[in-house]
C-alpha cells in the first residue's frame, strides 16, 4: 500500500515521503496513529496544501523535545524499591516506573520514550539509560535504584 507520511517515522521516511508499506502496518499502526494517509490523488493535493502547517507542527514538536532534553541532560533520578538483603529487588523497575520518576523530577515524559537496553532493572545499583524524546533528540540520564527498608 502506498502512503504519505505526515511525520518522520523511524526506518521509513520523512514528512511528505510517499512510501510502500505492508497493508497491515498501514491500516493497523500508521493510519490510526495519524502518522500517515493513503496516497490517493485527493490526499496528495490536501497534503500539498497543508505541507507548511505540518512542517511547522513538526518543528514545534522538535523544539519542545530539545527544551525537555536540556532539563534532563545528565540528570540523576533516584528510585526506591523494596529489596532483599542480597540487593535483588522484589519485582523490578520498568519503563513505567522510570517515566513516573522523571515526571516527578519535573519533566513530563511518556513510558514509550524510555529506552531500557537490558530490560527492567532487577537489582539495586546505578544504570545509564537514554530517553528518546524525539527521533532526533535522545538524552542520557542516570537511574539510581536504592532499597527501601
From Swiss-Prot:
Q: Does the keyword RNA-binding apply?
A: yes
One Pfam family this chain carries?
Answer: Ribosomal_L9_N
Q: Which InterPro entries match?
A: Ribosomal_bL9, Ribosomal_bL9/RNase_H1_N, Ribosomal_bL9_bac/chp, Ribosomal_bL9_C, Ribosomal_bL9_C_sf, Ribosomal_bL9_N, Ribosomal_bL9_N_sf
Q: Which GO terms describe its molecular function?
A: rRNA binding; structural constituent of ribosome
- Keyword Ribonucleoprotein annotated: yes
SUPFAM superfamilies found in the cross-reference section: L9 N-domain-like, Ribosomal protein L9 C-domain
Q: What role does it play?
A: Binds to the 23S rRNA.
Which protein are we looking at? Large ribosomal subunit protein bL9
Q: Which organism is it from?
A: Chromobacterium violaceum (strain ATCC 12472 / DSM 30191 / JCM 1249 / CCUG 213 / NBRC 12614 / NCIMB 9131 / NCTC 9757 / MK)
What gene is this protein a product of? Answer: rplI
Amino acid at each position: 500500500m502506498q502512503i504519505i507520511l505526515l511525520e518522520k517515522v523511524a526506518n521509513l521516511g520523512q514528512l511528505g515521503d510517499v512510501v510502500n508499506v505492508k497493508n497491515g502496518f498501514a491500516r493497523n499502526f500508521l493510519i490510526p496513529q495519524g502518522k500517515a494517509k493513503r496516497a490517493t490523488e485527493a490526499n496528495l493535493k490536501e497534503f500539498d496544501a497543508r505541507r507548511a502547517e505540518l512542517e511547522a507542527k513538526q518543528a514545534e514538536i522538535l523544539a519542545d523535545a530539545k527544551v525537555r532534553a536540556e532539563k534532563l541532560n545528565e540528570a540523576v533520578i533516584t528510585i526506591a524499591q523494596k529489596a532483599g538483603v542480597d540487593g535483588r529487588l522484589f519485582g523490578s523497575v520498568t519503563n513505567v516506573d522510570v517515566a513516573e520518576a522523571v515526571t516527578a523530577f519535573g519533566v513530563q515524559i511518556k513510558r514509550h520514550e524510555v529506552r531500557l537496553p537490558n530490560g527492567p532493572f532487577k537489582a539495586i545499583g546505578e544504570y545509564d539509560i537514554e530517553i528518546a524524546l524525539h527521533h532526533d533528540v535522545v538524552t542520557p540520564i542516570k537511574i539510581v535504584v536504592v532499597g527501601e527498608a
